[in-house]
Design a protein with these regions (language model features):
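Polar low-complexity intrinsically disordered regions enriched in Ser/Thr and small residues
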Residues: 16-18, 34-37, 70, 103, ...
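Aromatic- and Gly/Pro-enriched, solvent-exposed loop/edge beta-strand patches characteristic
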Residues: 78-170, 181
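Proprotein-processing/basic-patch segments
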Residues: 31-33, 142-208
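Ordered hydrophobic segments in well-structured contexts
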Residues: 27-29, 53-57, 71-73, 87-89, ...
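Bacterial N-terminal signal peptides
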Residues: 2-13
Length: 208
């Protein structure tokens, strides 16, 4: 299942991000027709204190040559109103699917979070937007979206689910990984643990 997603992207004329001409803000919606919901991504919500998810979005789904991504939105299907401490990382990648449960897109200390802080997930259904503190320079290829939940507690009385769509049932369709923890936050610089792997992708919106 692929999560529905919205990007907000500042598209730069001629695909040159350092150009000052022909700038245009565009909203990109991915998976708008998805009819599935999941609690496993983008923010894992199956009653664990720590979790990390990573999802691959293809260049043809994003549909722009290059740009600065300034926000991301996910489609809330079950509104829990959970308080979570998260960090979001975006990374340009050639990877188009996961071949195994440890086949992460590797993050390094040079990969700065585009957002880091405390959020409260929606109390109503609908699109939920996270505005980036640092816009991300998207270069036109595939994109890995990693969300590290560092909260350390969970509320068993509340539950979130997010809109998604299926990318198919075969191995080449596996485009989301998730891993959970109980005693400490997931080390995003050392993603060596075996992860859950599945063929759902979140619906989403990017502003560019």
């Amino acid at each position: 299942i692929f999560l529905m997603l919205i990007f907000s992207i500042l598209c730069i004329g001629g695909g040159k991000i350092n150009s000052l001409n022909a700038e245009e803000t565009e909203t990109i919606i991915i998976g708008e027709g998805g009819d599935v919901s999941t609690s496993h991504a983008p923010i894992y919500n199956d009653y664990t204190p720590y979790a990390l998810t990573q999802t691959l979005y293809h260049s043809d789904e994003i549909g722009v040559d290059a740009g600065l991504i300034s926000s991301i939105s996910f489609n809330s299907k079950m509104a829990g109103g959970l308080t979570r401490n998260i960090a979001i990382y975006l990374k340009n990648t050639d990877k188009d699917h996961y071949t195994g449960t440890k086949d992460w897109v590797v993050l390094t200390s040079e990969d700065e979070p585009v957002f880091e802080g405390v959020i409260v997930t929606p109390t109503n259904t609908g699109w939920y937007t996270i505005q980036f503190t640092t816009p991300f320079e998207y270069t036109g290829g595939n994109l890995a979206v990693t969300i590290n939940d560092k909260t350390g507690t969970y509320d068993s009385s509340k539950h979130d689910e997010w809109g998604a769509y299926s990318t198919g049932g075969d191995d080449a369709a596996k485009r989301t990984l998730y891993v959970t923890g109980w005693s400490s936050a997931i080390d995003y610089l050392n993603l060596s643990a075996s992860a859950g792997k599945y063929d759902y992708v979140n619906q989403g919106t990017y502003m560019a």
